[in-house]
């Protein structure tokens, strides 16, 4: 049988999603817990591999097993064998044609900036502190240049292994909630470090260091060296993965925490 799981995790203590030698990974912890419940080795596949320190409220994985368990038994059983910073939010038996990565039609991320001259002791590992006075309206306006299918070489990490720099951005919103600025972006997929590189450059616009038109200009140059430094990982969350309705996967609140599903 093939099982899909909704996964949440705090990425602080992990060197990213993917299993690696001699370092902690989210994949390793999940595979250990699932294999224990299944009473056999299980390999999992995820919708999107997050980097070191990046979080998720809406990651999706799947695995295959001969073990017969109720959906509730998978979610509760796996949770009982996971560390506190990783959890299963739902479990569902899926058809053989489902694949967590290749069946996905879109991924959605949110990046949270805490804007204050002084750092906060509350959620320091879940937001990125920014001491600059940012204009989120300018950031939102600048981000609209990134919509549609375009070449994102200017926002692509040098070590990116993707065969193409082209991605299709469905929406990009920048909103403020009190002292927090949230960048909400959805695309069919993302090149390596794409969201954090975009946020780093939007911060330059929000701080008044660059004009609104700079983001569109950067995109056209197709040169990563011209863009701003990569934003830190701790403010970034994978909040949702979209699939065709035929799979009927559960839908959780996007979050994280207090954030509503649709940011006006």
Swiss-Prot record:
GO terms for biological process: tRNA pseudouridine synthesis. SUPFAM superfamilies: Pseudouridine synthase. The active site is at 51 (nucleophile). Substrate binds at residue 109. GO terms for molecular function: RNA binding; tRNA pseudouridine(38-40) synthase activity. Gene3D superfamilies: Pseudouridine synthase I, catalytic domain, C-terminal subdomain, Pseudouridine synthase I, catalytic domain, N-terminal subdomain. InterPro entries: PsdUridine_synth_cat_dom_sf, PsdUridine_synth_TruA, PsdUridine_synth_TruA_a/b_dom, PsdUridine_synth_TruA_C, TruA/RsuA/RluB/E/F_N. Keywords: Isomerase, tRNA processing. Belongs to the tRNA pseudouridine synthase TruA family. This is tRNA pseudouridine synthase A. It comes from Pasteurella multocida (strain Pm70). The lineage of its organism: Bacteria, Pseudomonadati, Pseudomonadota, Gammaproteobacteria, Pasteurellales. The gene is truA.
